[in-house]
Amino acid sequence: MAHMVETMAYAGEVPWHGLGVKVADDLTPQEMMKVAGLDWSVERHPITTLVDGEEITIEGKKALVRSSDNKVLDVVGDQWIPVQNADAFEFFDEYVKAGGMTMHTAGSLKDGQIVWGLAKIDEYFSLFGGKDQVDSYLLLSNPHNYGRGVDVRFTPIRVVCNNTLSMSLEGKASLGISLNHKSEFNAERVRLALDEASKKMETYHEMADFLSKKYYKQADLFEYFNQVFPVTTNRAGTM
């Protein structure tokens, strides 16, 4: 299992890969960004090549360069507008200051191509009579590479690596919003979308609670799976 973690910080339990800087759960978004090693920006630079000794600029393309080490993160189009890490983490300010969330994890994946921030929501719900606690988080994924949009969503998954980020982003699109890089990051538009998504998150909680209270006999489960994944005669003969 590849974690693809470049740098990160976390509050709470140590991630499965053991990487990152452990922090208190009362950091501001800006403090979390700095401890996680994300206090850098990205800039678009012209791409040139030498042809018969003459320097020629490649039209329509820009190199996306990280300010901290001049690393080229990707090649993007002229119209591609980056979202700076500082702007991404500033988005968490309103929620953290209101007291409903605390910064929980943040980091850089794939050598800086993807940056994420995760805030833990104070509210949680329990299943199976309180035996299983399900936490809720607000995730912001900020890719610095072509072909991926900025994604902000609610998720029950604690993001600590590329795998858990992928699992979160594969969740229901209705729990958040995805923005392309053709325009500036619109924080107000995202907040409005999250207001609607929070209602759907409540529905998710109710459905999970309902299913957790259902009990089935083993024979019923076999019958159910046999209907969903029927075993053919040929396959049955080889089992």
Q: What is each model feature region?
A:
Residues 90-239:
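Intrinsic disorder/low-complexity polar-acidic segments
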Residues 1-91, 100:
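Feature for intrinsically disordered/low-complexity regulatory segments and propeptides
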